[in-house]
C-alpha cells in the first residue's frame, strides 16, 4: 500500500489548488525483466527492459480543466485502475574507436480507467472510461552519433489519441500526434575555457498539434545554445 499526501501547491496554489483534497492511496503490482550486456567491441552495450503493472488507486490526485479551459484545478478521482506494459531498449555501436552510434526507444501501453461508482443522478457517467489526457499508446525514440568533430542526434515523440475530459466521446477526443527534432553540437576548448555550441530544429515537420485542447503547440523553430565553462 502506497500513500501520497497532496503537496502544498496541490492544496493552496492560486486558482489551481484545492484545500479539500484527500490523500491518494494505491496498491501496486509489478513484474519486469531486464537484459543487459556488453556483446563485443562493435556492440559494447545492449539493453532491453519489459515491465507489466497493475495499480488500484483510491482518491487519485489529478489536474482537471475547469469551465475556463485555461484554468486547471486539482481534484480527487474516486477510484482508478491502471494496467499496462512498458518496454524500453537501447544499444550502442562502435564501428571505430573514436565514433559511437547510440539508439534508444520506449513504448507504453496503458489503460487508466475511472472505476468510480457511477452517480445515478448524472447522465454524464465516466465509468470505465480512460481518464483525461492519458493516451493508451505512447512512444519515443532517439538516435545519435558521437564523433571527435560533431555530435548529431534525432528524436521523436508519439502520443496516441486522448480525451480532454473524463467522458470518452468524440467531441472530447484529441488526435494523436508525433513530434520530430534534430540537433547538432560541438565542444571547443581554448586553453582553460570550454565552449559548447548546439543548434536544434524543433517540430521538424512543422506539424499542427495540441497537447492540451485549444492550445496549439508552436510550429517549426530553431534554437541555438552557447555555453561557456571555465
Task: Please place each PLM-identified region on the residue numbering.
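C-terminal structured "cap/appendage" subdomains that terminate the fold
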Residues: 178-199
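Structural signature of outer-membrane beta-barrel channels/translocons
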Residues: 24, 34-42, 90-96, 144-148, ...
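Surface-exposed extracellular loop regions of Gram-negative outer-membrane beta-barrel proteins
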Residues: 1-30, 45-48, 52-76, 160-167, ...
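Residues that define the transmembrane beta-barrel architecture of outer-membrane proteins
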Residues: 25-29, 81-85, 99, 133-139, ...
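Gram-negative outer-membrane beta-barrel transporters
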Residues: 45-56, 73-165, 194, 205
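Gly/Thr-rich phosphate-binding loop signature of adenosyl cofactor/nucleotide-binding cores
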Residues: 201-203
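Outer-membrane beta-barrel proteins
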Residues: 17-23, 38-40, 73-79, 93, ...
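Outer-membrane beta-barrel "beta-signal"
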Residues: 30-34, 88, 218-230
Amino acid at each position: 500500500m502506497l500513500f501520497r499526501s497532496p503537496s502544498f501547491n496541490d492544496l493552496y496554489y492560486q486558482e489551481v489548488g484545492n484545500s479539500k483534497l484527500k490523500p491518494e492511496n494505491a496498491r501496486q503490482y509489478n513484474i519486469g525483466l531486464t537484459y543487459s550486456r556488453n556483446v563485443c567491441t562493435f556492440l559494447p552495450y545492449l539493453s532491453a527492459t519489459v515491465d507489466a503493472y497493475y495499480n488500484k488507486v483510491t482518491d487519485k490526485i489529478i489536474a482537471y480543466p475547469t469551465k475556463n479551459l485555461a484554468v486547471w484545478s486539482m481534484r480527487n478521482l474516486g477510484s482508478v485502475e491502471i494496467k499496462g506494459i512498458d518496454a524500453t531498449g537501447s544499444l550502442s555501436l562502435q564501428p571505430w574507436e573514436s565514433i559511437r552510434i547510440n539508439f534508444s526507444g520506449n513504448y507504453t501501453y496503458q489503460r487508466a480507467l475511472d472505476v468510480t461508482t457511477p452517480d445515478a443522478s448524472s447522465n454524464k457517467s465516466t465509468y470505465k472510461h480512460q481518464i483525461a489526457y492519458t493516451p493508451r499508446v505512447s512512444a519515443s525514440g532517439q538516435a545519435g552519433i558521437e564523433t571527435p568533430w560533431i555530435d548529431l542526434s534525432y528524436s521523436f515523440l508519439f502520443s496516441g489519441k486522448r480525451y480532454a475530459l473524463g467522458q470518452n466521446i468524440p467531441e472530447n477526443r484529441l488526435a494523436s500526434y508525433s513530434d520530430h527534432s534534430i540537433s547538432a553540437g560541438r565542444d571547443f576548448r581554448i586553453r582553460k575555457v570550454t565552449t559548447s555550441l548546439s543548434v536544434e530544429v524543433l517540430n521538424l515537420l512543422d506539424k499542427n498539434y495540441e497537447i492540451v485542447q485549444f492550445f496549439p503547440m508552436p510550429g517549426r523553430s530553431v534554437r541555438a545554445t552557447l555555453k561557456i565553462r571555465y
